[in-house]
């Protein structure tokens, strides 16, 4: 039987108890409500105040808005009136049609709706001016608490509102979502699939209608039957076309909701229909099968009633599926499970989640087009061990989401262009270097790199080990990300970030004076001339000695070593604790310095006297310091310049402090354990000396 959504009055659902409350007080919704009831006050949310800061970040309201509680707007406010339905969603003076389309779709799935809109609240008994809504964010559910003060102008809600003026669940839901993202202005412009995922924790799937499979109608039918949320839109060629109205009443660049599918007999033919809703609550399709079109006159009243046909200008309309494919460009589906819509069976999916970051200078390597930095991206090992039932391969879905970009819009952040590539894993552990990607092609990749919040793809590969590389398209772009891997059989994933491993050589014994080289004899003469008979130099004197020697190294381009570097060198080599360096200590350090210079010259590929911060991981590893990404990020922040380059002085300073810290730890660790115990005095003493 064809599937058609119908409005059902929701049954009260228990409030989910695994959502984390988001409020600066640390108290739950119920604790805050009870506190207000006991004190006889109405809740005021200091985290999202009734002020312009909650409205806009780049402008001021053109007219003065007045924040009012529902009881100050109407005499008998209701939270939900006659069930939460798609007709409760009418767009206001905010360009968030994408959000409204998602909310309209949410009302078609009563179970999902009851999770997002808990029904333990209202304006009757227990009212305290406080409400809460739940949203999925990057692998967890958040319980967002708000007060019920809403922006109005002349006693009318300015933004989202219900067609029934005394119903407020949709307006309060919009406010909670605005709080989650920092302001109402942050909700301007977007994709319906973004909010759909936040309402369900589901998986996005996008279809370009002109490239859709032949059974596209059946795919949509199955999606609705499974409770998926569906949106659709018409592309624009330029900004001037945004929200332009076509002759047939459709709006370009505007988010619509798919609310139903059905088939009817019409003049001896079976016609496939699709029902679509405009969140404006008005402006509809005026072609065949529109509200007042002649096609309906040949349908019985019973059939019209079954299809829910009305001639009201409520924004919802039917159209022939063939017309839909002609006039719309894109369909977005948020599946509540990763099951393929082409598949008739449901599976139990295993899921693993990775939270990571692209950090400029260390892990923001860009796509494979940028070979010199691509290898520095986060690398995730995926082990597929079991074939799917009756299949030769292992099916999995990879969904890469960039985090918090909407909330960061006020700081100039936009959606980055993201994607991923999948490689066969070699028979070795550890972070793969540039040469691997130079000589190996990817086995699979995301369909495209695109500036959407999430990019997802479905793959089937033979059992084995693979490396998944999530990245932005361009290098040096920063963002946090969440990668979800869904697999039919249990898959093992591992972040290939390297563990800290320090390999320090034994300090060499002093060379007898009679065995010194000519260079060492020259050092001794220079050292004696600067230090005097005690043969000890201060940091200032060491600065003079090293710069005098290094300036003769024509292959090494640098201005000079800083006094800070020389102080750190003495801290590393000073065994007597007098703040000076003896000649034998200098000789030991000189051997070390020559090796470090050779490494620097090796990684100064353009002979500019600087090293790229992206090469630092390999350079430090060659020097005996295998470090994880987080520590590398801290080092880059401290030592790299604004162009992500390190000169020799920065490079040397970094190595000296790393070795000093490592040797101090070795001395203090008991039986070579991976931890030490320090009191506050010992800790400060150590940090001041490293």
Curated annotation (Swiss-Prot):
Ca(2+) 3 binds at residues 574, 576, 578, 580, 585. Predominantly expressed in stomach and small intestine, although low levels of expression in other organs. Residues 534-552, 561-589, 591-626 form the EF-hand domain. It is an enzyme of class 3 (hydrolase). The active site is at residues 97, 254, 278. GO terms for biological process: proteolysis. Ca(2+) 4 binds at residues 604, 606, 608, 610, 615. Residues 42-337 form the Calpain catalytic domain. Residues 1-24 are annotated as: Disordered. Ca(2+) 2 binds at residues 284, 291, 312, 314, 316. It comes from the Eukaryota. Ca(2+) 1 binds at residues 81, 83, 88, 167. Its EC number is 3.4.22.-. SMART domains: calpain_III, CysPc, EFh. Transmembrane segments: none annotated. Residues 338-521 are annotated as: Domain III. GO terms for cellular component: cytoplasm. Keywords: Calcium, Hydrolase, Metal-binding, Protease, Repeat, Thiol protease. Gene3D superfamilies: 2.60.120.380, Cysteine proteinases, EF-hand. Calcium-regulated non-lysosomal thiol-protease. Belongs to the peptidase C2 family. This is Calpain-9. It comes from Rattus norvegicus (Rat). The gene is Capn9.
């Amino acid at each position: 039987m064809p599937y058609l959504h119908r409005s059902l009055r929701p049954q009260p659902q228990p409030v989910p108890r695994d959502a984390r409350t988001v409020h600066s007080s640390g108290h739950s919704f119920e604790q805050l409500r009870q506190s207000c009831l006991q004190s006889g006050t109405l809740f005021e949310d200091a985290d999202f105040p009734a002020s312009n800061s909650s409205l806009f970040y780049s402008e001021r309201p053109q007219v003065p808005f007045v924040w009012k509680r529902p009881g100050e707007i109407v005499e008998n406010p209701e939270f939900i009136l006659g069930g939460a339905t798609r007709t409760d969603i009418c767009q206001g003076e905010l360009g968030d049609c994408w959000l409204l389309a998602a909310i309209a779709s949410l009302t078609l799935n009563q179970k999902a709706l009851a999770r997002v809109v808990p029904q333990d609240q209202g304006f009757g008994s227990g009212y305290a001016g406080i409400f809460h809504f739940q949203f999925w964010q990057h692998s967890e559910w958040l319980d967002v608490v708000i007060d019920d003060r809403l922006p109005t102008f002349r006693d009318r809600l300015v933004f989202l509102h219900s067609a029934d003026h005394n119903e407020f669940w949709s307006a309060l839901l919009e406010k909670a979502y605005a709080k989650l993202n920092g302001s109402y202005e942050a909700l301007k412009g977007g994709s319906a699939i973004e909010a759909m995922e936040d309402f369900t924790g589901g998986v996005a799937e996008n279809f370009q209608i002109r490239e859709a499979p032949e059974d596209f109608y059946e795919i949509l039918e199955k999606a609705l039957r499974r409770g998926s949320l569906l949106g659709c839109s018409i592309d624009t060629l330029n900004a001037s076309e945004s929200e332009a109205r076509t002759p047939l009443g459709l709006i370009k660049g505007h988010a619509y909701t798919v609310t139903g599918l059905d088939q009817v007999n019409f003049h001896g033919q079976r016609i496939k229909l699709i029902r679509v809703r405009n969140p404006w609550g008005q402006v509809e399709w005026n072609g065949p099968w529109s509200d007042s079109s002649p096609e309906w006159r040949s349908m019985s009243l019973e059939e019209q009633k079954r299809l829910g046909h009305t001639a009201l200008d409520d924004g919802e309309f039917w159209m022939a599926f063939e017309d839909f494919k002609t006039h719309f460009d894109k369909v977005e589906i948020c599946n509540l499970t990763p099951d393929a819509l082409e598949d008739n069976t449901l599976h139990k999916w295993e899921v693993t989640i990775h939270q990571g970051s692209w950090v400029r200078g260390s892990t923001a390597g860009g796509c494979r087009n940028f070979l010199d930095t691509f290898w520095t991206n986060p690398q995730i090992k995926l082990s597929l061990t079991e074939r799917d039932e009756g299949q030769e391969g292992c099916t999995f879905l990879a969904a890469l989401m960039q985090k918090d970009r909407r909330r960061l819009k006020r700081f100039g952040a936009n959606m980055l262009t993201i994607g991923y590539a999948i490689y066969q894993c070699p028979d070795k552990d550890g972070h793969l270097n540039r040469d691997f990607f130079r000589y190996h092609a990817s086995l699979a990749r995301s369909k495209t790199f695109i500036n959407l919040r999430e990019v997802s793809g479905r793959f089937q590969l033979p059992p084995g080990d693979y490396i998944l590389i999530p990245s932005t398209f361009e290098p040096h772009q920063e963002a946090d990300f969440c990668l979800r891997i869904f697999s039919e059989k249990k898959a093992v994933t591992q972040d290939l970030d390297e563990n800290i491993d320090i390999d320090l050589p034994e300090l060499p014994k002093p060379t007898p004076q009679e065995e010194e080289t000519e260079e060492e004899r020259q050092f001794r003469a220079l050292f004696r001339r600067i230090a005097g008979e005690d043969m000890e130099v201060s940091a200032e004197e060491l600065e003079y000695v090293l710069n005098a020697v290094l300036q003769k190294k024509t292959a090494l381009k640098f201005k000079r070593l800083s006094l800070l570097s020389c102080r750190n060198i003495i801290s590393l080599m000073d065994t007597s604790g007098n703040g000076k360096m003896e000649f034998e200590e200098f000789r030991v350090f000189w051997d070390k310095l020559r090796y470090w210079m050779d490494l620097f010259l090796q990684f100064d590929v353009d002979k500019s006297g600087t090293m790229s911060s992206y090469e630092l991981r390999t350079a430090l590893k060659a020097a005996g310091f295998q470090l994880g990404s987080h520590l590398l990020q801290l080092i880059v922040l401290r030592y790299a310049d604004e162009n992500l380059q390190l000169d020799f002085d920065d490079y040397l300073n970094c190595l000296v402090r790393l070795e000093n810290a490592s040797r101090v730890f070795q001395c203090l660790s008991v039986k070579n354990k991976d931890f030490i115990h320090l009191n506050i005095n010992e800790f400060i003493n150590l940090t001041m000396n490293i």
